[in-house]
Protein backbone atom coordinates (compact mmCIF):
# COMPACT_ATOMS: atom_id res chain seq x y z
CA UNK A 1 0.00 0.00 0.00
CA UNK A 2 1.51 3.31 -1.03
CA UNK A 3 1.47 6.51 1.00
CA UNK A 4 1.69 9.92 -0.65
CA UNK A 5 3.72 12.42 1.38
CA UNK A 6 4.88 15.81 0.11
CA UNK A 7 4.48 14.73 -3.49
CA UNK A 8 6.69 11.67 -3.10
CA UNK A 9 5.12 8.25 -3.60
CA UNK A 10 6.66 5.59 -1.39
CA UNK A 11 5.72 1.94 -1.21
CA UNK A 12 7.57 -1.06 0.20
CA UNK A 13 9.05 -2.18 -3.11
CA UNK A 14 10.26 1.29 -4.10
CA UNK A 15 11.70 1.80 -0.62
CA UNK A 16 13.75 -1.37 -0.83
CA UNK A 17 15.03 -0.55 -4.32
CA UNK A 18 15.71 3.13 -3.78
CA UNK A 19 17.32 3.10 -0.40
CA UNK A 20 18.69 -0.26 0.61
CA UNK A 21 18.77 -2.50 -2.45
CA UNK A 22 16.52 -5.48 -3.02
CA UNK A 23 18.34 -8.21 -1.10
CA UNK A 24 16.47 -9.24 2.03
CA UNK A 25 18.50 -10.91 4.79
CA UNK A 26 17.78 -11.95 8.37
CA UNK A 27 17.20 -8.76 10.39
CA UNK A 28 17.62 -6.76 7.16
CA UNK A 29 14.19 -6.58 5.64
CA UNK A 30 15.00 -3.66 3.37
CA UNK A 31 12.94 -1.46 5.67
CA UNK A 32 14.13 1.49 7.75
CA UNK A 33 15.94 0.80 11.02
CA UNK A 34 13.16 2.54 12.96
CA UNK A 35 9.80 0.95 12.20
CA UNK A 36 6.56 0.07 13.92
CA UNK A 37 5.74 -3.34 15.33
CA UNK A 38 2.84 -5.05 13.51
CA UNK A 39 0.30 -4.72 16.32
CA UNK A 40 -2.81 -6.84 15.64
CA UNK A 41 -5.63 -4.92 14.01
CA UNK A 42 -3.65 -1.67 13.72
CA UNK A 43 -4.26 0.66 10.76
CA UNK A 44 -1.96 3.66 11.11
CA UNK A 45 0.08 6.24 9.27
CA UNK A 46 3.60 4.92 8.49
CA UNK A 47 6.27 5.94 10.96
CA UNK A 48 8.91 6.48 8.27
CA UNK A 49 8.59 7.85 4.76
CA UNK A 50 11.42 8.04 2.24
CA UNK A 51 12.08 11.42 0.66
CA UNK A 52 14.61 12.41 -2.03
CA UNK A 53 16.14 15.08 0.17
CA UNK A 54 17.22 14.98 3.79
CA UNK A 55 14.87 16.68 6.23
CA UNK A 56 16.49 18.96 8.75
CA UNK A 57 16.64 17.33 12.18
CA UNK A 58 18.27 18.80 15.25
CA UNK A 59 19.25 15.40 16.64
CA UNK A 60 22.93 14.51 16.72
CA UNK A 61 24.50 11.11 16.28
CA UNK A 62 25.42 10.99 19.96
CA UNK A 63 21.90 11.90 21.03
CA UNK A 64 20.37 9.34 18.72
CA UNK A 65 22.76 6.65 19.94
CA UNK A 66 21.91 7.37 23.57
CA UNK A 67 18.18 7.21 22.86
CA UNK A 68 18.47 3.96 20.88
CA UNK A 69 20.53 2.28 23.58
CA UNK A 70 18.24 3.45 26.38
CA UNK A 71 15.10 2.28 24.57
CA UNK A 72 16.68 -0.80 22.92
CA UNK A 73 14.76 -0.07 19.74
CA UNK A 74 15.61 -0.29 16.08
CA UNK A 75 15.26 -3.33 13.91
CA UNK A 76 12.79 -6.07 14.77
CA UNK A 77 12.87 -5.38 18.50
CA UNK A 78 9.52 -7.12 18.99
CA UNK A 79 11.04 -10.44 17.84
CA UNK A 80 11.19 -13.54 19.98
CA UNK A 81 13.53 -13.87 22.95
CA UNK A 82 14.35 -17.57 23.27
CA UNK A 83 16.57 -18.87 26.03
CA UNK A 84 20.13 -18.87 24.68
CA UNK A 85 22.78 -21.29 26.01
CA UNK A 86 25.58 -19.46 27.80
CA UNK A 87 28.24 -21.43 25.94
CA UNK A 88 26.81 -20.46 22.53
CA UNK A 89 28.15 -16.92 22.44
CA UNK A 90 29.37 -16.48 18.84
CA UNK A 91 26.45 -15.36 16.66
CA UNK A 92 26.69 -15.95 12.90
CA UNK A 93 24.09 -14.28 10.66
CA UNK A 94 25.05 -14.86 7.00
CA UNK A 95 22.99 -13.35 4.20
CA UNK A 96 24.21 -15.54 1.35
CA UNK A 97 25.88 -18.87 0.70
CA UNK A 98 29.13 -17.00 -0.02
CA UNK A 99 29.04 -15.27 3.37
CA UNK A 100 28.06 -18.50 5.09
CA UNK A 101 31.02 -20.34 3.54
CA UNK A 102 33.43 -17.62 4.69
CA UNK A 103 32.03 -17.62 8.22
CA UNK A 104 32.01 -21.41 8.47
CA UNK A 105 35.60 -21.67 7.25
CA UNK A 106 36.77 -19.19 9.86
CA UNK A 107 34.77 -20.85 12.65
CA UNK A 108 36.24 -24.24 11.77
CA UNK A 109 39.76 -22.85 11.58
CA UNK A 110 39.40 -21.24 15.01
CA UNK A 111 37.59 -24.31 16.44
CA UNK A 112 34.55 -22.25 17.40
CA UNK A 113 31.78 -24.43 15.96
CA UNK A 114 30.43 -25.51 19.34
CA UNK A 115 30.18 -21.89 20.47
CA UNK A 116 28.19 -20.84 17.40
CA UNK A 117 24.57 -19.70 17.25
CA UNK A 118 23.63 -19.78 13.57
CA UNK A 119 20.78 -17.46 12.63
CA UNK A 120 18.55 -18.55 9.76
CA UNK A 121 17.58 -21.92 8.33
CA UNK A 122 19.16 -21.80 4.87
CA UNK A 123 22.72 -22.73 5.82
CA UNK A 124 22.32 -25.19 8.67
CA UNK A 125 24.28 -27.99 6.99
CA UNK A 126 27.50 -26.09 6.55
CA UNK A 127 28.81 -26.05 10.12
CA UNK A 128 28.46 -29.30 12.11
CA UNK A 129 28.10 -28.60 15.82
CA UNK A 130 26.52 -25.17 15.44
CA UNK A 131 23.15 -24.47 17.08
CA UNK A 132 20.73 -23.10 14.51
CA UNK A 133 17.88 -20.68 15.31
CA UNK A 134 15.22 -18.92 13.27
CA UNK A 135 15.62 -15.36 12.04
CA UNK A 136 12.66 -13.91 13.94
CA UNK A 137 14.67 -13.13 17.09
CA UNK A 138 14.92 -9.72 18.72
CA UNK A 139 18.36 -8.47 17.59
CA UNK A 140 18.91 -6.67 20.90
CA UNK A 141 18.34 -9.95 22.72
CA UNK A 142 20.93 -11.64 20.49
CA UNK A 143 23.48 -8.85 20.80
CA UNK A 144 23.09 -8.73 24.56
CA UNK A 145 23.86 -12.45 24.79
CA UNK A 146 26.74 -12.59 22.32
CA UNK A 147 30.42 -12.10 22.99
CA UNK A 148 30.89 -11.49 19.25
CA UNK A 149 28.70 -11.23 16.15
CA UNK A 150 29.63 -12.06 12.56
CA UNK A 151 27.16 -10.76 10.04
CA UNK A 152 26.59 -9.44 6.55
CA UNK A 153 27.02 -5.76 5.81
CA UNK A 154 23.31 -5.15 5.20
CA UNK A 155 22.15 -6.82 8.38
CA UNK A 156 20.75 -4.44 11.00
CA UNK A 157 22.04 -6.85 13.64
CA UNK A 158 25.44 -5.27 12.88
CA UNK A 159 24.25 -1.85 14.02
CA UNK A 160 22.45 -3.25 17.06
CA UNK A 161 25.60 -5.13 18.07
CA UNK A 162 27.73 -2.02 17.75
CA UNK A 163 25.22 -0.01 19.79
CA UNK A 164 25.34 -2.76 22.42
CA UNK A 165 29.10 -2.34 22.72
CA UNK A 166 29.91 -5.82 21.42
CA UNK A 167 32.49 -6.76 18.75
CA UNK A 168 31.03 -7.12 15.27
CA UNK A 169 32.77 -8.61 12.24
CA UNK A 170 31.35 -7.52 8.88
CA UNK A 171 31.39 -9.81 5.84
CA UNK A 172 31.01 -8.12 2.46
CA UNK A 173 30.07 -4.58 1.50
CA UNK A 174 26.81 -2.79 2.18
CA UNK A 175 24.75 -0.66 4.45
CA UNK A 176 26.79 -1.19 7.64
CA UNK A 177 30.19 -2.05 6.16
CA UNK A 178 31.84 1.03 7.79
CA UNK A 179 31.58 -0.83 11.09
CA UNK A 180 34.11 -3.34 9.78
CA UNK A 181 36.48 -0.94 8.05
CA UNK A 182 38.19 0.67 11.03
CA UNK A 183 39.47 -0.34 14.41
CA UNK A 184 37.45 1.18 17.21
CA UNK A 185 34.22 1.66 15.26
CA UNK A 186 32.68 3.73 18.08
CA UNK A 187 34.62 6.61 16.52
CA UNK A 188 32.39 6.46 13.46
CA UNK A 189 29.27 4.95 15.01
CA UNK A 190 27.60 8.28 15.77
CA UNK A 191 27.90 9.44 12.18
CA UNK A 192 26.66 6.10 10.88
CA UNK A 193 23.62 6.26 13.17
CA UNK A 194 22.87 9.83 12.06
CA UNK A 195 23.15 8.82 8.41
CA UNK A 196 20.98 5.75 8.94
CA UNK A 197 18.23 7.58 10.81
CA UNK A 198 18.23 11.00 9.17
CA UNK A 199 19.38 10.72 5.56
CA UNK A 200 16.52 10.75 3.06
CA UNK A 201 13.97 9.81 5.72
CA UNK A 202 11.16 11.72 7.37
CA UNK A 203 9.25 10.54 10.42
CA UNK A 204 5.50 10.80 10.82
CA UNK A 205 3.38 10.56 13.93
CA UNK A 206 1.43 7.33 13.30
CA UNK A 207 -1.59 8.73 15.17
CA UNK A 208 -1.92 11.97 13.22
CA UNK A 209 0.33 11.78 10.16
CA UNK A 210 2.08 14.97 11.27
CA UNK A 211 5.85 15.34 11.08
CA UNK A 212 7.87 14.24 14.09
CA UNK A 213 11.62 14.16 14.73
CA UNK A 214 13.75 11.05 15.10
CA UNK A 215 14.07 11.34 18.87
CA UNK A 216 10.29 11.49 19.25
CA UNK A 217 10.00 8.41 17.03
CA UNK A 218 12.53 6.57 19.20
CA UNK A 219 10.65 7.56 22.35
CA UNK A 220 7.39 6.21 20.90
CA UNK A 221 9.06 2.93 19.91
CA UNK A 222 10.64 2.65 23.36
CA UNK A 223 7.20 2.86 24.95
CA UNK A 224 5.97 0.07 22.69
CA UNK A 225 9.06 -1.97 23.56
CA UNK A 226 8.32 -1.69 27.29
CA UNK A 227 4.74 -2.79 26.66
CA UNK A 228 5.75 -5.79 24.53
CA UNK A 229 8.46 -6.87 26.97
CA UNK A 230 5.96 -6.87 29.83
CA UNK A 231 3.62 -9.03 27.75
CA UNK A 232 6.24 -11.67 26.90
CA UNK A 233 5.77 -13.35 30.28
CA UNK A 234 2.05 -14.07 29.81
CA UNK A 235 1.19 -17.75 29.32
CA UNK A 236 -2.59 -17.46 29.59
CA UNK A 237 -5.34 -14.84 30.00
CA UNK A 238 -8.52 -15.77 31.88
CA UNK A 239 -11.89 -14.10 32.28
CA UNK A 240 -11.85 -11.69 29.32
CA UNK A 241 -15.24 -11.37 27.63
CA UNK A 242 -15.28 -11.64 23.85
CA UNK A 243 -16.45 -8.04 23.41
CA UNK A 244 -13.36 -6.73 25.26
CA UNK A 245 -10.80 -8.61 23.20
CA UNK A 246 -10.51 -6.14 20.32
CA UNK A 247 -8.91 -3.78 22.84
CA UNK A 248 -6.82 -6.32 24.68
CA UNK A 249 -5.39 -7.89 21.51
CA UNK A 250 -3.13 -4.87 21.02
CA UNK A 251 -2.47 -4.04 24.66
CA UNK A 252 -1.45 -7.62 25.57
CA UNK A 253 0.38 -8.51 22.33
CA UNK A 254 3.81 -10.07 22.96
CA UNK A 255 5.36 -9.45 19.55
CA UNK A 256 4.42 -12.75 17.95
CA UNK A 257 0.91 -13.88 18.87
CA UNK A 258 -2.45 -12.63 20.05
CA UNK A 259 -3.04 -12.94 23.78
CA UNK A 260 -3.51 -16.60 24.79
CA UNK A 261 -7.11 -16.33 25.95
CA UNK A 262 -7.99 -19.39 27.96
CA UNK A 263 -11.38 -20.12 26.42
CA UNK A 264 -10.43 -19.64 22.77
CA UNK A 265 -7.10 -21.45 23.00
CA UNK A 266 -8.22 -24.36 25.16
CA UNK A 267 -5.79 -23.41 27.91
CA UNK A 268 -6.66 -24.71 31.35
CA UNK A 269 -5.30 -23.73 34.73
CA UNK A 270 -4.09 -27.27 35.31
CA UNK A 271 -1.88 -27.02 32.20
CA UNK A 272 0.11 -24.17 33.77
CA UNK A 273 2.84 -24.61 36.32
CA UNK A 274 6.02 -23.28 37.88
CA UNK A 275 7.54 -20.53 35.77
CA UNK A 276 4.33 -19.68 33.88
CA UNK A 277 2.48 -16.39 34.22
CA UNK A 278 -1.24 -15.74 33.87
CA UNK A 279 -3.49 -12.70 33.80
CA UNK A 280 -7.01 -12.81 35.20
CA UNK A 281 -9.97 -10.47 34.80
CA UNK A 282 -11.28 -11.57 38.16
CA UNK A 283 -14.92 -10.51 37.87
CA UNK A 284 -15.46 -13.03 35.04
CA UNK A 285 -13.00 -15.75 36.03
CA UNK A 286 -14.04 -18.92 37.87
CA UNK A 287 -14.13 -18.48 41.63
CA UNK A 288 -10.85 -19.36 43.27
CA UNK A 289 -8.90 -19.49 40.00
CA UNK A 290 -6.18 -16.98 41.02
CA UNK A 291 -5.56 -18.87 44.26
CA UNK A 292 -5.29 -22.19 42.41
CA UNK A 293 -2.86 -20.69 39.92
CA UNK A 294 -0.65 -19.22 42.64
CA UNK A 295 -0.62 -22.47 44.59
CA UNK A 296 0.68 -24.13 41.43
CA UNK A 297 3.57 -21.68 41.18
CA UNK A 298 1.99 -19.56 38.43
CA UNK A 299 2.73 -15.84 38.73
CA UNK A 300 -0.73 -14.27 38.55
CA UNK A 301 -1.66 -10.70 37.71
CA UNK A 302 -4.97 -8.91 37.40
CA UNK A 303 -6.50 -6.94 34.54
CA UNK A 304 -9.00 -4.17 35.21
CA UNK A 305 -10.48 -1.17 33.42
CA UNK A 306 -8.29 1.90 33.28
CA UNK A 307 -9.20 5.29 34.71
CA UNK A 308 -10.02 6.90 31.35
CA UNK A 309 -12.05 4.02 30.07
CA UNK A 310 -14.31 4.67 27.09
CA UNK A 311 -17.11 6.70 25.58
CA UNK A 312 -19.86 4.69 27.23
CA UNK A 313 -20.46 2.30 30.09
CA UNK A 314 -18.83 -1.05 30.65
CA UNK A 315 -22.19 -2.32 31.90
CA UNK A 316 -23.48 -1.71 28.36
CA UNK A 317 -20.62 -3.83 26.95
CA UNK A 318 -18.72 -0.85 25.57
CA UNK A 319 -15.13 -2.13 25.18
CA UNK A 320 -12.50 -0.40 27.31
CA UNK A 321 -9.91 1.79 25.63
CA UNK A 322 -7.71 1.61 28.70
CA UNK A 323 -6.70 -1.20 31.04
CA UNK A 324 -4.35 -1.73 33.95
CA UNK A 325 -2.26 -4.86 34.47
CA UNK A 326 -0.96 -5.47 37.98
CA UNK A 327 1.04 -8.45 39.23
CA UNK A 328 1.23 -7.18 42.83
CA UNK A 329 -2.41 -6.63 43.69
CA UNK A 330 -5.34 -4.77 42.21
CA UNK A 331 -5.18 -1.02 42.91
CA UNK A 332 -8.55 -0.76 44.65
CA UNK A 333 -7.80 -3.36 47.32
CA UNK A 334 -5.89 -1.75 50.22
CA UNK A 335 -5.27 -5.13 51.87
CA UNK A 336 -2.02 -5.46 49.92
CA UNK A 337 0.24 -3.16 47.90
CA UNK A 338 -0.37 -2.71 44.18
CA UNK A 339 1.97 -1.59 41.44
CA UNK A 340 0.09 1.72 41.40
CA UNK A 341 0.60 2.20 45.12
CA UNK A 342 4.31 1.44 44.72
CA UNK A 343 4.57 3.99 41.90
CA UNK A 344 2.92 6.67 44.02
CA UNK A 345 5.01 5.74 47.06
CA UNK A 346 8.42 5.24 45.44
CA UNK A 347 8.64 6.43 41.83
CA UNK A 348 11.19 9.10 40.96
CA UNK A 349 8.87 11.40 39.04
CA UNK A 350 10.95 13.84 37.03
CA UNK A 351 10.15 17.53 36.53
CA UNK A 352 9.43 16.82 32.85
CA UNK A 353 6.92 14.14 33.80
CA UNK A 354 5.31 16.45 36.36
CA UNK A 355 4.94 19.11 33.68
CA UNK A 356 3.41 16.54 31.33
CA UNK A 357 0.99 15.48 34.07
CA UNK A 358 -0.04 19.09 34.67
CA UNK A 359 -0.72 19.56 30.96
CA UNK A 360 -2.74 16.33 30.89
CA UNK A 361 -4.75 17.37 33.93
CA UNK A 362 -5.55 20.73 32.36
CA UNK A 363 -6.64 19.05 29.12
CA UNK A 364 -8.94 16.63 30.93
CA UNK A 365 -10.53 19.42 32.95
CA UNK A 366 -10.87 21.73 29.95
CA UNK A 367 -12.54 18.97 27.90
CA UNK A 368 -14.77 17.98 30.81
CA UNK A 369 -13.88 14.32 30.42
CA UNK A 370 -14.46 11.67 33.06
CA UNK A 371 -13.86 7.91 33.17
CA UNK A 372 -16.64 7.27 30.67
CA UNK A 373 -15.79 10.23 28.42
CA UNK A 374 -19.15 11.88 29.00
CA UNK A 375 -18.11 15.49 28.52
CA UNK A 376 -18.99 18.54 30.54
CA UNK A 377 -22.49 19.85 29.77
CA UNK A 378 -23.81 22.55 32.09
CA UNK A 379 -25.08 22.64 35.66
CA UNK A 380 -25.91 25.74 37.70
CA UNK A 381 -25.46 25.91 41.47
CA UNK A 382 -29.01 25.81 42.86
CA UNK A 383 -28.18 27.38 46.24
CA UNK A 384 -25.99 30.30 45.23
CA UNK A 385 -23.15 31.04 47.63
CA UNK A 386 -24.08 28.22 50.00
CA UNK A 387 -21.49 25.43 50.24
CA UNK A 388 -22.31 22.74 47.65
CA UNK A 389 -21.17 19.17 48.30
CA UNK A 390 -21.40 16.30 45.84
CA UNK A 391 -22.02 12.78 47.18
CA UNK A 392 -21.30 10.07 44.60
CA UNK A 393 -23.12 6.75 44.61
CA UNK A 394 -21.34 3.57 43.59
CA UNK A 395 -22.07 0.03 42.46
CA UNK A 396 -22.38 -1.69 45.81
CA UNK A 397 -21.31 -5.14 44.65
CA UNK A 398 -18.37 -3.78 42.67
CA UNK A 399 -15.01 -5.20 43.73
CA UNK A 400 -13.66 -1.77 44.63
CA UNK A 401 -16.50 -1.38 47.14
CA UNK A 402 -16.16 -4.89 48.50
CA UNK A 403 -12.38 -4.51 48.85
CA UNK A 404 -11.90 -0.89 49.83
CA UNK A 405 -15.32 0.36 50.86
CA UNK A 406 -14.79 -0.25 54.60
CA UNK A 407 -18.35 -1.56 54.86
CA UNK A 408 -19.85 1.78 53.82
CA UNK A 409 -22.96 1.62 51.59
CA UNK A 410 -24.42 4.40 49.44
CA UNK A 411 -27.06 4.94 52.15
CA UNK A 412 -24.33 5.17 54.80
CA UNK A 413 -22.39 7.66 52.69
CA UNK A 414 -25.34 10.02 52.32
CA UNK A 415 -26.02 10.04 56.06
CA UNK A 416 -22.34 10.47 56.96
CA UNK A 417 -21.93 13.32 54.50
CA UNK A 418 -24.89 15.16 56.04
CA UNK A 419 -23.48 14.63 59.52
CA UNK A 420 -20.13 16.12 58.47
CA UNK A 421 -21.67 18.87 56.30
CA UNK A 422 -24.77 19.96 58.29
CA UNK A 423 -25.16 23.32 56.54
CA UNK A 424 -24.17 22.34 53.00
CA UNK A 425 -26.37 21.86 49.97
CA UNK A 426 -25.93 18.12 49.31
CA UNK A 427 -26.27 16.72 45.80
CA UNK A 428 -26.48 12.95 45.39
CA UNK A 429 -25.35 11.54 42.04
CA UNK A 430 -26.31 7.86 41.50
CA UNK A 431 -23.77 5.72 39.68
CA UNK A 432 -24.45 5.50 35.91
CA UNK A 433 -24.26 1.68 35.87
CA UNK A 434 -26.89 1.56 38.62
CA UNK A 435 -29.03 4.09 36.76
CA UNK A 436 -28.65 2.00 33.59
CA UNK A 437 -30.39 -0.82 35.43
CA UNK A 438 -27.53 -3.30 35.44
CA UNK A 439 -25.94 -3.09 38.90
CA UNK A 440 -26.71 -3.00 42.63
CA UNK A 441 -26.83 0.21 44.67
CA UNK A 442 -30.15 1.91 43.96
CA UNK A 443 -31.78 4.00 46.71
CA UNK A 444 -35.31 5.44 46.37
CA UNK A 445 -35.28 9.20 45.93
CA UNK A 446 -37.56 9.68 48.92
CA UNK A 447 -34.98 8.02 51.15
CA UNK A 448 -32.09 10.00 49.68
CA UNK A 449 -33.92 13.28 50.17
CA UNK A 450 -34.20 12.70 53.91
CA UNK A 451 -30.54 13.77 54.03
CA UNK A 452 -29.64 15.24 50.63
CA UNK A 453 -31.12 18.34 49.04
CA UNK A 454 -31.12 17.04 45.48
CA UNK A 455 -30.80 13.87 43.41
CA UNK A 456 -29.02 14.75 40.17
CA UNK A 457 -29.24 12.37 37.23
CA UNK A 458 -28.92 14.43 34.07
CA UNK A 459 -25.78 16.49 34.66
CA UNK A 460 -22.44 14.89 33.90
CA UNK A 461 -20.04 14.23 36.74
CA UNK A 462 -17.64 16.72 35.15
CA UNK A 463 -20.25 19.49 35.20
CA UNK A 464 -21.01 18.78 38.85
CA UNK A 465 -17.35 18.67 39.84
CA UNK A 466 -16.73 22.00 38.14
CA UNK A 467 -19.36 23.71 40.27
CA UNK A 468 -19.36 22.13 43.73
CA UNK A 469 -17.04 23.03 46.58
CA UNK A 470 -16.34 19.54 47.90
CA UNK A 471 -16.94 15.86 47.23
CA UNK A 472 -17.61 12.86 49.50
CA UNK A 473 -16.80 9.42 48.09
CA UNK A 474 -16.39 5.87 49.32
CA UNK A 475 -13.85 4.70 46.74
CA UNK A 476 -15.24 6.41 43.63
CA UNK A 477 -12.86 7.68 40.96
CA UNK A 478 -14.90 10.89 41.12
CA UNK A 479 -12.76 11.75 44.14
CA UNK A 480 -9.62 11.65 42.01
CA UNK A 481 -11.37 13.65 39.28
CA UNK A 482 -12.37 16.20 41.91
CA UNK A 483 -8.77 16.53 43.09
CA UNK A 484 -7.76 17.36 39.52
CA UNK A 485 -10.23 20.25 39.67
CA UNK A 486 -8.90 21.55 42.96
CA UNK A 487 -11.87 20.44 45.07
CA UNK A 488 -11.88 19.27 48.69
CA UNK A 489 -12.27 15.49 48.83
CA UNK A 490 -13.36 13.34 51.78
CA UNK A 491 -12.90 9.58 51.45
CA UNK A 492 -15.04 7.20 53.53
CA UNK A 493 -13.38 4.05 52.20
CA UNK A 494 -9.77 3.53 51.13
CA UNK A 495 -9.36 4.41 47.44
CA UNK A 496 -5.94 4.42 45.80
CA UNK A 497 -5.75 8.23 46.00
CA UNK A 498 -6.21 8.31 49.80
CA UNK A 499 -3.29 8.68 52.16
CA UNK A 500 -0.96 10.91 50.13
CA UNK A 501 -1.71 14.22 51.83
CA UNK A 502 -4.30 15.40 49.30
CA UNK A 503 -7.57 14.15 50.83
CA UNK A 504 -9.41 14.05 54.16
CA UNK A 505 -9.48 10.34 54.91
CA UNK A 506 -12.03 8.74 57.23
CA UNK A 507 -11.18 5.16 56.27
CA UNK A 508 -8.23 3.20 57.66
CA UNK A 509 -5.42 4.07 55.24
CA UNK A 510 -2.55 1.52 55.21
CA UNK A 511 0.42 2.67 57.27
CA UNK A 512 2.72 1.82 54.35
CA UNK A 513 1.46 4.90 52.47
CA UNK A 514 3.92 7.42 53.85
CA UNK A 515 4.81 9.64 50.88
CA UNK A 516 3.43 13.15 50.57
CA UNK A 517 2.74 13.69 46.89
CA UNK A 518 1.77 16.73 44.90
CA UNK A 519 -1.37 16.54 42.79
CA UNK A 520 0.58 16.29 39.55
CA UNK A 521 2.83 13.56 40.92
CA UNK A 522 -0.35 11.61 41.70
CA UNK A 523 -1.67 12.31 38.20
CA UNK A 524 1.62 11.20 36.63
CA UNK A 525 1.61 7.86 38.44
CA UNK A 526 -2.12 7.23 38.01
CA UNK A 527 -2.74 8.30 34.42
CA UNK A 528 0.66 8.18 32.68
CA UNK A 529 2.85 5.50 34.26
CA UNK A 530 0.32 2.86 35.35
CA UNK A 531 -2.38 2.25 32.69
CA UNK A 532 -2.24 1.12 29.06
CA UNK A 533 -4.22 2.95 26.39
CA UNK A 534 -5.49 2.05 22.91
CA UNK A 535 -6.12 4.60 20.17
CA UNK A 536 -9.65 3.89 18.86
CA UNK A 537 -8.75 5.24 15.42
CA UNK A 538 -5.47 3.47 14.59
CA UNK A 539 -5.90 0.58 17.09
CA UNK A 540 -2.33 1.17 18.25
CA UNK A 541 -1.28 1.30 21.90
CA UNK A 542 -0.94 5.01 22.54
CA UNK A 543 0.07 7.65 25.07
CA UNK A 544 -2.78 8.85 27.24
CA UNK A 545 -2.84 12.21 25.47
CA UNK A 546 -3.84 10.56 22.18
CA UNK A 547 -6.90 8.91 23.74
CA UNK A 548 -7.89 12.12 25.53
CA UNK A 549 -7.68 13.99 22.22
CA UNK A 550 -9.82 11.36 20.46
CA UNK A 551 -12.44 11.55 23.21
CA UNK A 552 -12.50 15.33 23.18
CA UNK A 553 -13.01 15.27 19.39
CA UNK A 554 -15.77 12.62 19.62
CA UNK A 555 -13.57 10.08 17.79
CA UNK A 556 -13.82 7.36 20.42
CA UNK A 557 -17.47 6.33 20.17
CA UNK A 558 -18.05 2.61 19.65
CA UNK A 559 -21.30 1.01 18.52
CA UNK A 560 -22.43 -2.59 18.17
CA UNK A 561 -25.64 -4.63 18.31
CA UNK A 562 -24.58 -5.90 21.74
CA UNK A 563 -24.20 -2.35 23.09
CA UNK A 564 -27.64 -1.41 21.71
CA UNK A 565 -29.19 -4.51 23.24
CA UNK A 566 -27.63 -3.84 26.66
CA UNK A 567 -28.82 -0.23 26.59
CA UNK A 568 -32.38 -1.33 25.84
CA UNK A 569 -32.20 -4.04 28.48
CA UNK A 570 -31.10 -1.48 31.06
CA UNK A 571 -33.87 0.92 30.07
CA UNK A 572 -36.42 -1.85 30.48
CA UNK A 573 -35.08 -2.79 33.92
CA UNK A 574 -35.22 0.84 35.03
CA UNK A 575 -38.77 1.27 33.74
CA UNK A 576 -39.95 -1.88 35.52
CA UNK A 577 -38.29 -0.71 38.75
CA UNK A 578 -40.17 2.61 38.64
CA UNK A 579 -43.43 0.81 37.87
CA UNK A 580 -43.00 -1.45 40.90
CA UNK A 581 -42.26 1.52 43.15
CA UNK A 582 -45.29 3.46 42.01
CA UNK A 583 -47.63 0.47 42.26
Locations of regions flagged by a protein language model:
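Catalytic-core helical/loop segments in enzymes performing group transfer/polymerization on anionic/lipid-linked
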Residues: 1-583
